[in-house]
Design a protein with these regions (language model features):
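Cytosolic-side transmembrane-helix boundaries in multi-pass membrane proteins
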Residues: 1-25, 75, 79-102, 124-232, ...
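Single transmembrane alpha-helix segments in multi-pass membrane proteins
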Residues: 69-72, 242-294, 324-334, 338, ...
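Transmembrane alpha-helical segments in multi-pass inner-membrane proteins
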Residues: 97-104, 110-113, 277, 300, ...
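Membrane-embedded helix boundary and interhelical linker motif in transport proteins
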Residues: 117-125, 269, 276-320
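Extracellular/periplasmic helix-loop junction at the C-terminal end of a transmembrane helix
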Residues: 119, 152-153, 180-191, 345-386, ...
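Pore- or pathway-lining transmembrane helices of multi-pass membrane proteins that form conduits
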Residues: 275-281, 328-353, 361-362, 474-488, ...
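Alpha-helical transmembrane segments within multi-pass membrane transporters and channels
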Residues: 297-343, 500-501
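Helix-loop-helix "hairpin" substructures at the membrane interface of multi-pass membrane proteins
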Residues: 392-471
Length: 570
């Protein structure tokens, strides 16, 4: 960090509490124990936790423990050693505490998992206990180290090429981490992998690395966006032709595209919509009715680009129809009306069966047998070989959905930065004040509903072909609740937050099916905890954080500094 620039006023103060002499050596000893234990076997049975039974040949979970130990060593060297210059910027002590706590919990759960799977603690090999002892020693060491006053990270600068390299390294870590996690079929291994990632992320947050990376992202926003899409593009090539994982990925993208549309309504305009899944369903039903399925009810089969536009426009029209009369109300009343609209849509799809109404949807049977998409001679149902790697039908739909996500993100970002977006935010903050300032409150509310519905309709047209069938039971209130949960969990008004929230709410139920009976209870508990401890969401903008923490003067200063950084980047 010798190239880091700072103002004289930002020079660090000396450490206050004295370091206990034993703390640092104990931490290094803990690192050595974790690594040494990871090279020993942790269980006798090779079928447990993807085989941790071979000495001097670490398995996947053992390698993760080694990585955590190496990170702990880096933080120790930042506290005392050749990396102390970095330690004047990053809070090594807080990071080490988070890493030590997470690693101790990780090793304890591994011991529990092995004992449960092999019927007793006696079947846990000594290597696991050695690593557990090392993790506990790292944690104890971290609490003996003093806290320091640090330089202001917002003033940290590296050469542009170094910051771009940091973005590339971070994105590569995300790609390989996601590929490894999705490749785990054992539930215990997947949970432990998630715990490892959570530990590393929390440690990086506590040290300040994530804050610094946020400033870097602001300075190189285009590079970060490009890197994110490059990672997403190469993701199918890491799955070895696995249709199971790519099926999950396509569902995540459909869910995310729809959630970003809802984010316009909820996150920007502040309108609570509990029936949003109906707009996704309207797009899907339009695509199904205009498809070449033997059960399609309309004898007209236009090209898919035309179908996409029709489906999106039908959804937007429904948004206008529901929005125009109902947006005169607000708050709880609006939520009740939109909830009713979602149920009306589902019941209408049940009744348009040729008996209770016109024959459009085949009633509860839906429209099955929807053929694969075919655009310009390219059949999305065919397998293709690229660079020796097999890409199945779900990979084909994944790339199409990636284009859709790029479009949806572009629309959201442009609207958010436009006069319309500022009008929505003004309405969300104080509707009466916005109206007094001349903002067309009703018009902007209706526009938010229409644009959000349009984007959901786009996703629905692709979903119909990807699922090969549509039925009313796919578009129940619970799906609207999960969409709203994705927006709230990730961070209202943000793009990255909604993408993260959508990924969590779609991925975890698929990988943790043995928790299916408790899914709703766990998600409800998660939302309650979020509302209590982080109401702004996992990835909230600084301004959104300030809305929930008005008393935080340091946060207010950080918001202003972030604004200056953005202006400087422009």
């Amino acid at each position: 960090m010798s190239d880091v620039k700072t103002s004289p006023a930002a020079e660090p103060q000396t450490a206050q509490p004295p370091v206990r002499p034993i703390a640092w050596p104990a931490g290094v000893a803990g690192v050595v124990l974790v690594i040494a234990g990871s090279f020993l076997s942790w269980s006798y049975d090779g079928s447990i936790l993807n085989d941790l039974s071979i000495d001097f040949y670490p398995g996947g979970l053992q390698i993760l423990a080694i990585i955590a130990a190496v990170l702990a060593l880096v933080l120790l060297l930042a506290e005392r050693g050749p990396l102390t210059a970095m330690g004047t910027w990053l809070d090594a002590t807080l990071g080490l505490r988070a890493l030590g706590a997470g690693l101790t919990l990780y090793m304890a759960l591994i011991v529990v998992a092995i004992s449960v799977e092999s019927d007793g603690l006696i079947n846990v090999n000594p290597g696991a206990y050695v690593s557990l002892a090392g993790a506990a020693l790292i944690l104890a060491c971290a609490w003996m180290l003093p806290l320091r006053q640090l330089r202001d990270l917002s003033k940290a600068r590296l050469p542009a090429w170094s910051e771009i390299l940091a973005i590339a390294v971070m994105m590569a870590a995300v790609l390989f981490g996601a590929a490894y996690a999705l490749g785990l079929t054992d539930a215990w291994s997947f949970i432990l992998c998630l715990l490892f990632f959570a530990t590393v992320i929390v440690a990086l947050v506590r040290t300040g690395v994530i804050t610094w990376f946020g400033h870097v992202g602001q300075r190189h926003k285009k590079v970060l966006t490009l890197a994110a899409f490059v990672v997403a593009f190469f993701f199918p090539f890491t799955q070895g032709g696995s249709d199971a994982n790519m099926s999950i990925a396509t569902q995540v993208l459909i869910f995310a595209a729809t959630a970003i549309g809802l984010n316009i309504v909820v996150g920007l305009a502040g309108l609570l919509d509990l029936g949003y899944i109906a707009f996704l369903g309207s797009g899907a039903y339009v695509a199904a009715m205009l498809s070449e399925s033997a059960f399609a009810t309309i004898d007209w089969h236009p090209p898919f680009p035309v179908v996409v536009l029709i489906g999106a426009c039908v959804a937007a029209t429904l948004g206008l129809i529901i929005g125009s009369p109902t947006l005169r109300v607000s708050g709880d009343y609006l939520a009740i009306v939109t909830l009713g609209f979602g149920e009306i849509f589902r019941l209408a799809m049940f009744n348009l069966d040729g008996i209770n109404g016109p024959l459009l949807t085949n009633g509860p049977n839906g429209i099955p047998g929807i053929p694969e998409l075919q655009i310009g001679g390219f059949n999305f149902g065919d397998e293709h070989t690229v660079a020796g790697l097999e890409l199945g039908r779900f990979s084909n739909y994944y790339f199409l959905l990636l284009i859709l996500i790029a479009f949806v993100i572009l629309v959201f970002a442009r609207l958010n930065e436009s006069r319309i977006g500022r009008g929505w935010v003004a309405i969300r903050e104080d509707e009466k004040a916005a109206e007094a300032m001349g903002v067309n409150v009703f018009g902007l509310k209706v526009l938010a509903f229409a644009i959000g519905a349009f984007l959901a309709g786009l996703a629905g047209t692709i979903k119909a072909h990807q699922d090969a069938a549509v039925s009313p039971d796919q578009y129940i209130f619970l799906e609207s609740a999960f969409l709203l949960a994705a927006v709230v969990l990730g961070g209202m008004g943000t793009i990255a937050g909604v993408l993260l929230g959508a990924t969590i709410l779609k991925l975890l139920p698929e990988k943790l099916r043995f928790f299916s009976e408790y899914r709703l209870m766990l998600f409800g508990l998660l939302l309650v905890l979020m509302m209590r401890f982080r109401p702004e969401g996992l990835v909230a903008s600084r301004r959104r954080q300030l809305e929930f923490h008005e008393e935080d003067e340091e946060l207010a200063v950080a918001v202003e500094e972030e604004r200056l950084i953005v202006e400087e980047a422009k």
